[in-house]
Amino acid sequence: FRYNLLYLKKKKRGGVWVDLDMICLNYIDLNEEYIFTQEVDEDNKKSRITTSFLKFSRYSDFGKNLIQEAEKIINKRKKISWGVIGPWFLADHVKKCGLENFVWDYKRTCQIPWCNVKIFLDNTSIDISQPFLHLFSEMWRLNNMEKNTFHQMGVYGQLLKKHEIEKLYNQINTCLKTSMLDNIASFLTKFFIKKL
């Protein structure tokens, strides 16, 4: 899906895919023709390309070849195993096309490794000069970590405070309650008028 989205994007230049659990920490110019990012496991000396943040041009040869190879692997199956056309597949394609110079250091998006997601709730600091931070929400779920709580501590708590998420939540909640009450009142009024 993400490869097709970038390849067929309506803008002349293609687009940028960013996972929904990626937080923008700082503005960064994304005018490079290609962008591939990396992540690490426990060993931060062994980074690898990942699919959480990527960019390539609309109708690019790279995108066309990537999609064609993915379609061969999928072979019209409705279901394939996770990762089959994911990070390793993308990394191999980047290498085959000689695009390694467009690969970002893992710290630009994934400075906290996916396997260390509990750090988000610890009193650990991050490099706030980096442009993005990947939260790896699926790992939160697997580790029974609650995202829907207003944590006061840790990296996640700092981000919630910085972006005033609790205030936003309360405003939305108030609007929803008001809207629901208005809708209920309107419904009841119409209902009783019909009964009369």
Feature map (PLM): residue ranges:
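Glycosyltransferase-associated regions of secretory-pathway enzymes
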Residues: 1, 18-196
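A conserved donor-nucleotide-binding helix/loop in the catalytic core
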Residues: 1-18
